[in-house]
């Protein structure tokens, strides 16, 4: 294409960007600036999806200064079109270079296509209209970002995501107990921030071992393609940019990478919108000597607007460590540890009052006095009277309690920055039952242990303990690779018999090492032909998906899945309820992580935990410490990390040297300390914080709405019809799933997101949750979003001609159906769509210019129409031109009235909502310092910007259908 600086073009795929200007032509690339949104796009000159904008004599064009020009002729100089004509205000003869055209101009192209005989198939008009309706529905939903992820509809998770995800630059601490889904909550918030345009560039910092887990979670659950950055990736990226972090929008990296000054400086300079830090409780801090890791995160949190910290519960951490996390979120607010402790102490009255309000009994005098004092600036006596009175409707009393609770929440010290759910406050967890199976130590292992002891060597206590816990590994070290420990290990014999006696059950088996997992699979296959599959860190994501799918399959699937420690990270198998621990990890957190593969919200059965172990060995002693000391098999142990830190040396000594007195002593001390910590945690429970974190009835209402949307048959029909029109092959696979594949006859050369070898999808959430290899299709899924964009961003369905066979109407009667779009060019981050979503406006005109759309609905009208071929359609349009021209003008008049009303309503809604929120936050700031000034300033600026964008809103003709009555 011939490009010149200053020329005006429009994007064929992103028409909402408005009129673009060529700002750079270099080599094979052209750069176009779209001033309406402030965005740049770079295209290949040979294949740019752009259309040159040149007006014709008779057209009216608008300058960037706001005046119009009636075009009489046009000339060209150096590739730039110059329009000549009459100034709309002065009546003078003037010229206007195309470079100075108004960039908010919209292009009503369908008439040009119609009169040029470019007529689409009838069904494409319908699909285009449906696509615009779907875009409107999604953009106007206050649940945008929550429907699409492949996650269970868990109330507390959806509540936190709904509350935090819609904030500007959220800065919060997610501190739920293990198993309650902090990663999912963070993913939901990230997904919501991206879909709503509040964030575009996101950096996730995780421990080295969790990088792959996060990559998988973000892709499989949230359809977000993050890139993992390590030193090698940074070096490779230099070919594209001086700062490697600018080469991707969504990045996962480890703290280790950012400890290097060069990489940290680059990350600090990379203009992120949101920072997410997992395992934030490992960031060590004291006022005198913060750790390097803490300093890295602190530096990033000072320059990145939004921050999510995922951490252990505050009760696990201790107050000082908890304060250190809060300090990262808001150093101005949490500036002094002693002041923080004093403030925490003052919250006890708030918690006591909240406890009373959360119950159903009448309020004691002490609670009423506390409430009156805490909410001193508000008259709460009417609410108190309702709660205390007899014979009052229960719903009315509950509403009064809820109102006062909300007032308390708004004033709670960390209520806006800390979310912490516990198993005590969240229902729906199964019970856990522990089953142990002792076996005699094989002679081969005893011999290997003796030889190892004689050989000596300088090994750390931890290395000796690890060796004692895995005798099969020690044995293999002294034998050649052909030796097979599984041929004599009694735990393997037990496992085979267990699987044979539980043929109908799915069994998850976890071992520490990938080599152990592979050997177990070989043993099951060669000795008994038991169907099992393996899951370890040496496999690719696709291989793991296939293994997980094979295990999940009810008919013909694997009975057992054998995982290594690292390989099982980030994968959950709630459809299984039997867990075999072939060995035990040294760390209580890893043990909980193993059990957590099954013990999650959504598990429908009680969990049976099975441990085959070798008697009188380190395996038995570690089992006793976990079971008798921590009760870690049958209950979650939030204090496990603390207890292991305190007793690690004693435990390692007991594992390495068999001393029954030392073991008894260790178990007694551990039990005693465990009870102390548990009691302290129970005493420290913050009822108000729990209420705020799980959302109560509001959370349930969100989940109910999402569940109703899941069963939307209209959406399913529309999406399948969309794929039909585009030309995607669809094969019914059974089990509520469809295989989608690109076909040779697709309407578009590529369908971004649709793999060449196809993808299996389902509209059923339960099916998607049980199968990692099946994508959950909702309106938010990229395959749906891309499909909508392909249709609405192209000319597909913009013109159509149809025949209406109806003898009640005179033959030759003409109707003109016009679909307009009320839209405005604005960056996604402005949130304009919340008030003025892209809205299709339907006008149905008879030949006299009367609008019949209110009397004749779209669906019933559409069913009566028959298609005509393109050639005949073109002739009918040509013959009808004298009637059509005035109808277009009339249709625009009708639609403009609707748009003006919509803009007025949008302005009123925006002003009411944002003013109310601003007023609320301003008044709260006086009593709760957690209200950040940045949030208030953002709301003020947003109101100004939105008014500007609403002023620039325009009407765009999107599609035309001409209908003629025939009796033939």
From Swiss-Prot:
Indicate yes or no for the key word ATP-binding.
yes
Name the GO terms of the biological process aspect: regulation of DNA-templated transcription
UniProt xrefs under Pfam families: Helicase_C, RapA_C, SNF2-rel_dom, Tudor_1_RapA, Tudor_RapA
Per UniProt, ATP binds at 176-183
Record key words, sorted: Activator, ATP-binding, DNA-binding, Helicase, Hydrolase, Nucleotide-binding, Transcription, Transcription regulation
Q: What is its EC number?
A: 3.6.4.-
Query: What are the residue boundaries of the Helicase C-terminal domain, all occurrences included?
Result: 491-655
Q: Which family does it belong to?
A: Belongs to the SNF2/RAD54 helicase family. RapA subfamily.
What's this chain's function? Answer: Transcription regulator that activates transcription by stimulating RNA polymerase (RNAP) recycling in case of stress conditions such as supercoiled DNA or high salt concentrations. Probably acts by releasing the RNAP, when it is trapped or immobilized on tightly supercoiled DNA. Does not activate transcription on linear DNA. Probably not involved in DNA repair.
* Subunit annotation: Interacts with the RNAP. Has a higher affinity for the core RNAP than for the holoenzyme. Its ATPase activity is stimulated by binding to RNAP.
State the name under which the record lists this protein.
Answer: RNA polymerase-associated protein RapA
Q: Which gene encodes it?
A: rapA
């Amino acid at each position: 294409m011939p490009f010149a600086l200053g020329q005006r073009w429009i994007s064929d795929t992103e028409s909402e960007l408005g009129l673009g200007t060529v700002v750079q032509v270099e080599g094979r690339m052209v750069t176009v600036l779209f001033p309406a949104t402030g965005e740049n796009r770079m295209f290949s000159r040979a294949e740019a999806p752009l259309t040159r904008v040149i007006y014709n004599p008779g057209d009216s064009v608008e300058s960037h200064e706001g005046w119009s020009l009636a075009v009489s002729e046009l000339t060209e100089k150096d590739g730039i079109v110059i329009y000549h004509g009459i100034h709309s205000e002065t009546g003078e003869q003037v010229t206007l270079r195309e470079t100075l055209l108004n960039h908010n101009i919209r292009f009503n192209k369908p008439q040009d296509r119609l009169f040029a005989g470019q007529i689409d198939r009838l069904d494409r008009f319908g699909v285009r209209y449906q696509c615009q309706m779907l875009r409107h529905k999604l953009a106007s939903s206050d649940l945008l970002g929550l429907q699409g992820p492949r996650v269970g509809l868990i109330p507390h998770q959806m509540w936190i995501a709904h509350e935090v995800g819609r904030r500007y630059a959220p800065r919060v601490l997610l501190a739920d107990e293990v198993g309650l889904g902090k990663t999912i909550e963070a993913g939901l918030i990230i997904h919501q921030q991206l879909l709503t345009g509040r964030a575009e560039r996101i950096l996730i910092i995780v421990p080295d071992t969790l990088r792959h887990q996060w990559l998988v979670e973000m892709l499989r659950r949230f359809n977000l393609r993050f890139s993992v950055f390590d030193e090698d990736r940074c070096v490779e990226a230099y070919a594209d940019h001086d700062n490697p972090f600018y080469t991707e929008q969504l990045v996962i990296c480890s703290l280790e990478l950012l400890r290097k000054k060069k990489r940290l400086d680059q990350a600090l300079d990379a203009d992120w919108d949101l920072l997410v830090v997992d395992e934030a409780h490992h960031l060590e801090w004291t006022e005198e000597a913060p750790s390097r890791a803490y300093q890295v995160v602190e530096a990033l949190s000072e320059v990145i607007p939004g921050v999510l910290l995922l951490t252990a519960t505050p009760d696990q951490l201790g107050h000082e460590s908890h304060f250190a996390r809060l300090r990262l979120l808001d150093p101005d607010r949490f500036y002094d540890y002693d002041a923080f402790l004093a403030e925490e102490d003052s919250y006890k009255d708030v918690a006591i009052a909240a406890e009373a309000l959360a119950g159903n009994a009448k309020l004691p005098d002490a609670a009423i006095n506390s409430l009156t004092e805490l909410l001193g600036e508000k008259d709460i006596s009417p609410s108190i009277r309702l709660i205390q009175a007899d014979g009052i409707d229960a719903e009315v009393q509950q509403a009064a309690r809820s109102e006062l609770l909300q007032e308390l929440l708004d004033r709670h010290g960390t209520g806006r920055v800390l979310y912490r759910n516990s198993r005590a406050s969240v229902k729906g967890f199964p019970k856990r039952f522990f089953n142990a199976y002792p076996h005699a130590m094989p002679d081969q292992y005893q011999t290997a242990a003796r030889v190892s002891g004689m050989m000596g060597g300088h090994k750390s206590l931890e290395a000796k303990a690890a060796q004692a816990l895995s005798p099969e590994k020690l044995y293999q070290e002294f034998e050649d690779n052909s030796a097979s420990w599984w041929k004599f290990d009694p735990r393997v014999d037990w496992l085979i018999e267990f699987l044979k006696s539980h043929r109908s059950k799915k069994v998850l088996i976890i071992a520490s090492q990938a080599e152990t997992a592979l050997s177990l699979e070989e043993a099951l296959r060669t000795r008994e032909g038991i169907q099992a599959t393996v899951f370890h860190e040496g496999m690719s994501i696709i291989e793991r998906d296939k293994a997980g799918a094979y295990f999940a399959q009810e008919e013909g699937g694997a009975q057992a899945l054998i995982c290594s420690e690292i390989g099982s990270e980030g994968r959950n198998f709630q459809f299984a309820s039997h867990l075999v621990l072939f060995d035990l990890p040294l760390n209580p957190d890893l043990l909980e992580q193993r059990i957590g593969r099954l013990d999650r919200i959504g598990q429908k059965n009680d969990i049976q935990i099975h441990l085959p172990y070798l008697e009188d060995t380190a395996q038995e002693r570690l089992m006793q410490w976990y079971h008798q000391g921590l009760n870690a098999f049958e209950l979650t142990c939030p204090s496990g990390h603390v207890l292991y830190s305190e007793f690690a040396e004693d435990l390692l000594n007991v594992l390495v040297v068999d001393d029954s007195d030392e073991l008894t002593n260790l178990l007694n001390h551990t039990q005693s300390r465990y009870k102390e910590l548990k009691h302290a945690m129970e005493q420290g429970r913050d009822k108000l914080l729990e209420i705020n974190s799980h959302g109560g009835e509001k959370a349930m209402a969100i989940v109910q709405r999402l569940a109703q949307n899941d069963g939307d048959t209209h959406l399913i029909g529309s999406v399948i019809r969309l794929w039909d029109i585009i030309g995607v092959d669809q094969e019914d696979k059974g089990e509520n799933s469809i295989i989608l594949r690109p076909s040779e006859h697709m309407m578009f050369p590529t369908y971004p997101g649709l793999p060449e070898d196809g993808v299996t999808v389902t509209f059923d959430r339960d099916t998607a949750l049980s199968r990692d290899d099946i994508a959950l299709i909702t309106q938010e899924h990229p395959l749906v979003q891309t499909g909508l964009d392909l249709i609405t961003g192209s000319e597909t369905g913009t013109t159509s001609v149809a025949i209406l066979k109806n003898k009640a109407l005179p033959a030759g009667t003409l109707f003109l159906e016009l679909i307009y779009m009320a839209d405005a060019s604005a960056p996604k981050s402005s949130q304009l769509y919340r008030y003025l979503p892209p809205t299709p406006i339907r006008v149905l005109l008879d030949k006299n210019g009367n609008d019949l759309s209110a009397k004749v609905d779209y669906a019933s009208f559409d069913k009566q129409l028959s298609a005509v071929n393109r050639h005949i359609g073109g002739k009918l349009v040509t013959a009808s031109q004298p009637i059509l021209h005035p109808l277009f003008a009339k249709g625009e008049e009708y639609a403009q009235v609707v748009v003006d009303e919509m803009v007025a309503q949008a302005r009123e809604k925006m002003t009411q909502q944002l003013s109310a929120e601003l007023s609320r936050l301003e008044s709260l700031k006086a009593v709760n310092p957690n209200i950040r000034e940045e949030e208030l300033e953002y709301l003020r600026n947003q109101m100004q910007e939105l008014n500007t964008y609403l002023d620039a809103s325009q009407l765009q003709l999107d599609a035309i259908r001409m209908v003629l009555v025939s009796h033939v």
